[in-house]
Amino acid sequence: PRDFDLHTIDLETVACIIVESHTYAKKLKPYTEEFWRNLDMIRIVYDIPIIVDDIFMGGGKLGKFFGWETTSFRPSIFTMGKAITGGYYPLSITCYDDYIDKALGDNFNWDHGYTYSFYQPGIISMLYYLEQLNFDKFDTIQRVVREIFEGHGFEIQANAGLIFSTKREKPFHLIAPLNATGEYYNVLNRTLTNLKESDI
């Protein structure tokens, strides 16, 4: 990944553009609405598919199962992994819009043979994870985790949904679980209480 000036790139030679739904590398700073509007304009004017990498931010960490749904943008193609089973099983998905579907045609063969076949434990782990998601409690989890960190003298430097970047003496990062309960909060509280200043 790199920053670049659009004026130095010949967009006629670009096959696709890949972005994350929310950047981790830039300290969880969200992309602006203007950024997403410009991407959409580039897609329309230059016929460039926009691929959203939702591997890290998907799975509910931002408050929606699909991380890109927290933006105003709809990708041409998006991919997810890891988080779709809560990290319990290596499973990934890739989906695409009607425009890509039309370009592939009716007879496009998705058969990967033995290189990729659906495996029952992977599907079961994803279904179980989906059952655990409770977005009704999302705001509460976010608020309580924030309060626990601040109560232990941590500064919340940034947060994207349930992903927190904090600092006391040193940076400390945490992804809160989507099914956090009182037990989780107690463990987090005890963990932060037991940390020495030299540890953080």
Label each residue range with its predicted role.
Residues 1-200:
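Conserved N-terminal phosphate-binding loop of PLP-dependent enzymes in the Aspartate aminotransferase
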